[in-house]
Amino acid sequence: MKIHFRDLVSGLVKEIDEIEKSDRAQGDKTRRYQGAARKFKNAVFMDKRKYRGNGMKNRISLTTFNKYLSRARSRFEERLHHSFPQSIATISNKYPAFSEIIKDLDNRPAHEVRIKLKELITHLESGVNLLEKIGSLGKIKPSTAKKIVSLKKMYPSWANDLDTLISTEDATELQQKLEQGTDLLNALHSLKVNHEVMYALTMQPSDRAALKARHDAALHFKKRNIVPIDYPGYMQRMTDILHLPDIAFEDSMASLAPLAFALAAASGRRQIEILITGEFDAKNKSIIKFSGQAKKRMAVSGGHYEIYSLIDSELFIQRLEFLRSHSSILRLQNLEIAHDEHRTELSVINGFVAKPLNDAAKQFFVDDRRVFKDTRAIYARIAYEKWFRTDPRWAKCDEDVFFSELLGHDDPDTQLAYKQFKLVNFNPKWTPNISDENPRLAALQELDNDMPGLARGDAAVRIHEWVKEQLAQNPAAKITAYQIKKNLNCRNDLASRYMAWCADALGVVIGDDGQARPEELPPSLVLDINADDTDAEEDEIEEDFTDEEIDDTEFDVSDNASDEDKPEDKPRFAAPIRRSEDSWLIKFEFAGKQYSWEGNAESVIDAMKQAWTENME
């Protein structure tokens, strides 16, 4: 029997709920939790009866398995360990100096508990270092006050406690509290917060080691296969999008995706931060105060920090407000999540927007290998080249600190994977060209006198005036015979004749199928067409799976799985490329062969169906 991943997770949740509500002893419940998790992992990855010999071909990779486990654990993130309340009470009584802070962890939602616990651990860790400093002070004297003021700056979370040193002139009480805090820190590291099943929904040590080795190899490959990006071309293309008139964007995710991409490229923020969670306030022309960073397990973090903007900060704020004013974006902010949904709210939203945003990235770079998240690494590289050596803020920091703080990484090692892009033709004084010129409109005006003779009456003149009006409102407007026919209710042959006559002026060529396509694609921003940072192909491709693709993945959960069962061949489609409003380029692989199709279609689904029909029938 084959079932979808989403149903597999729902079944796991149902089983855990039944165990939790039963009147079994807690030890028996824990064993059953572990058994349910083991059954889930066997179905997805670990069953040796299915996944051996030829069956290994059907098994997902370690990277995907890790992602699936994470998705399964997310269904239990708002549940706490059964012993958590009792453990909190015990710890509170054992460490009276911190009793109130510890009690504050109880009776809170699980995500708040994790945030508060992390803050407390950070506070106590700084206290370990402070204890060493206090021990060297000796008897508190007026001359010691300067040292205490200095310590308050170094350890701001202990400022109130340090103030008592001056008033009491005795460090004994604070020393005792800090010593108690050191013991508490050890106790908190042993505290079980998560529900029992979450500890069982993890990889085996051998699989974790293999996954780490694979990630290390991928990072090693990336660092030796730098991708060169044309800096002027990148900045100019970003600027062109941000200066498009409002009318150039329709109220749909597909139409707004290039604008969201450009804003992410200018700020280095994640897609969810641009669309929903991020709060931005311009400090000066090139610095923005940012808060609302998306976090794993921590939902959205509070507080703000300063980031650079690659464009004028005020322009960034204006275009962001324009983007978020559209109903297609507002709907994401007010999305209702089904009660049985096993994804987090941010994951559900990412599932809606991932494909159009990644499509926008491929069109922007003119490179099918590029994806939306590349903007963060490129942004970090540009910011480094522009400000690291010139901004006094980084005078005493190395580049690892720069990348870590700019990208908002808690772990400084995380930024190691964000250095695979190299800027070509970089010049810190280079500025993009912002022009009001409208060359296509000017070229069309040169053809005004041709229109009366192109068709009977004033039909061609009316078409011509309408097209010029569209270009006057939006110089980048895409003009097709389909649009002309739809808006002016004219004959197909007349619309096609007009497009053929004005093709040069419009910057298009008419193909053998009668469809208009751009005269030439803009150059790829990846200057070395052989540059490829996609080693560990399996890992990279699977990281870009959409949530819907994960949900629809089928697993065989029957007891008599056979090595001889062979999966039915299915086509694997690359990201569709939109040539114009109704023209598509579709590429796919089937049975080991590559196929492509280009033509008109009402939607991307229609285009994919036509591509399949033309190549297979």
From Swiss-Prot:
Domain of life: Viruses
Basic and acidic residues composition-biased segments: 563-575
Protein residues bound to DNA: R270, K295, R376, H409
UniProt keyword list: DNA replication, DNA-binding, Endonuclease, Hydrolase, Nuclease, Viral DNA replication
Enzyme Commission no: 3.1.22.-
Coiled coil: none
The keyword S-adenosyl-L-methionine appears for this protein: no
Keyword Cell membrane: no
A GO MF term: DNA binding
Ranges of Acidic residues composition bias in the record: 535-562
Stored Pfam families: ResT-TelK_cat, TelK_muzzle, TelK_N, TelK_stirrup
UniProt record similarity statement: Belongs to the Caudoviricetes Protelomerase family.
Subunit description: Monomer. Homodimer; in presence of DNA.
Protein name per the record: Protelomerase
